Structures are given as structure tokens and as C-alpha cells.
Regions:
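Negatively charged linear elements and acidic catalytic determinants
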Residues: 1-33
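Soluble catalytic domains of membrane acyltransferases
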Residues: 23-197
Length: 197
């Protein structure tokens, strides 16, 4: 248990270090830190319109979002409003500097229609939404490793409303080889896997 706890805390601290250092990271370093395993259909779908990604809380979605803005399309997503408001504003400005378009959501605030309108305005977008935590009463029960878990319905509902393809996104850290480590400016990289549902 201690070993697993130490690994989890190391991963969490790595995320915060990477996130806070990201604005000082070069474009070449961002591109070198992410290795993508993409569905063959993904680029074709993006040529037609936006795509929706159902994500879990894992890895560093800020780094992958910066990568996606450079390699796929502009990222349009929702961020939970934090208190104090100045902290939230700083997080939004940080993500916007990385190339993302952010819609803020306060507690109890309905954001779905605003997200639909934003998705119809411009694009195509990569629209990543966290699905492994339901903050509303409208989640759906799914089977997760033999147990029932409540997931957010937002990604599937948005894809259905806008008639967009839905993908799942996962990621994990990997140690980088000497050459890639040098290019990334970090011993760690992320493997991003995107598959259509």
C-alpha cells in the first residue's frame, strides 16, 4: 500500500510540476512529450467536423490539450469554476495561452447549451470532456470492472445532439529514451490513446 501511495503521490506532483512549467515549454518540447496512438478514423472525422472525447482523470490533459491544439485542432472544453475567482481566471488564461478555448462552469450551472453554441461557432474542435465523475443528477450507470459506476452523460449527449463522432481518451506516462528525452526536456512523456466509440 505504501509503495502504491508513493507512486500515486509522485505522479500527482509530476502533474503539478508539468502544468505549472508548461507555459515556459517550447513547442518542440510539447510535441516530443506526447506520443499519440490515434484511431485511423480520427483525422478523417476532424476534416469533416468536430469530435467529442470522453476522458478520465489521468495523466496531464493540459499538456495533451496543448499538443492537440498543435497536431489535431483547437481544443474546446469546460472548466469547473474554482474559488477564489482569481485562481479560476488564472487557470483559464493559462489554458488559453496554450491555444484552448475554455467555457467556465460554476456549481449547479447548466453549461450544455453554451457548449453546443460554442461548438457550432467555428471549429472543427477537439472537445474533451471528463466522463469518469458525474457532478449532476443526470449521470448514467455503467459497468466498470464488474462494478456499477456513475459516469457523466455529457460527452455522449453532446456527440448525439451535434451528430459528432464520440471517442474515448486515455493516457499513461512513459519514460523517454535518450534522444526523445533531450527533445522533450523531461524524462517523462505521455502516451495518448484515442478510439472511436
Amino acid at each position: 500500500m505504501r509503495r502504491a501511495s508513493r507512486r500515486a503521490m509522485r505522479s500527482y506532483m509530476r502533474y503539478f510540476y508539468e502544468a505549472f512549467a508548461l507555459t515556459g515549454t517550447s513547442e518542440e518540447q510539447i510535441l516530443a512529450r506526447v506520443r499519440a496512438d490515434l484511431s485511423p478514423r480520427l483525422r478523417t472525422d476532424l476534416q469533416r467536423d468536430s469530435i467529442v472525447l470522453a476522458l478520465g482523470h489521468m495523466g496531464n490533459w493540459d499538456l495533451v490539450g496543448a499538443w492537440a491544439c498543435r497536431r489535431l485542432s483547437t481544443v474546446l472544453t469546460v472548466a469547473e469554476r474554482l474559488e477564489p475567482a482569481d485562481l479560476f481566471d488564472q487557470f483559464v488564461a493559462f489554458r488559453e495561452r496554450l491555444g484552448m478555448r475554455i467555457i467556465g462552469q460554476g456549481r449547479g450551472e447548466k453549461v450544455f447549451d453554451r457548449l453546443v453554441a460554442a461548438a457550432r461557432d467555428g471549429g472543427p474542435y477537439v472537445i474533451p470532456l471528463l466522463a469518469d465523475r458525474d457532478l449532476s443528477a443526470s449521470g448514467v450507470d455503467v459497468d466498470l470492472c464488474g462494478h456499477t459506476a456513475r459516469f457523466a452523460a455529457g460527452p455522449a449527449a453532446l456527440a448525439e445532439r451535434l451528430d459528432l463522432p464520440l471517442y474515448t481518451g486515455t493516457m499513461h506516462y512513459e519514460r523517454l529514451s535518450v534522444e526523445r528525452r533531450r527533445a522533450a526536456g523531461s524524462p517523462w512523456g505521455l502516451v495518448l490513446t484515442l478510439r472511436e466509440v
